[in-house]
Amino acid sequence: MNMESKVILQGIRIKRMTHRIIIGIGSNFQPTENVRRAGALLTRLFHDCEWSPFVTTEPVGLHSDPFLNGLLRASTTLDEAEVNRLLKDAESRLGRTPTDKRNGKVVIDLDLMAFDGQRRHERNWLFPFQAQLLKALNDKPNNIIDII
């Protein structure tokens, strides 16, 4: 679902495509606080933000505390590589460090789950809660973060 947006810079008209993205958000360390902080940052980085509810899930493949997980659907004129770089930068700004995950601590996890309807991170889509979150996002998206 690409739409064109026109940007005029010093009299030069540049066409940029608008892309629809879905971002997976998760945290198992002070999750309510960290998800809210991530949400505040993501709403400044992307447009037309719609949120699924956030749900608590048990960790898979980690010995850790439960996770708080949710999805964000948004629009951007950035390409896929730029979105991924922006998400990794956001994780760092929000306090994620390379050693944390090895220790079972996930301050924040931001994954590009879909770009223009094409799924990414296929393994993550296999988690049962992802289907629940996507259904909720499609049925009744929220304009604000709803933490259950």
Go through each PLM region and give its residues.
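Short, surface-exposed acidic-centric catalytic microdomains
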Residues: R36-D79
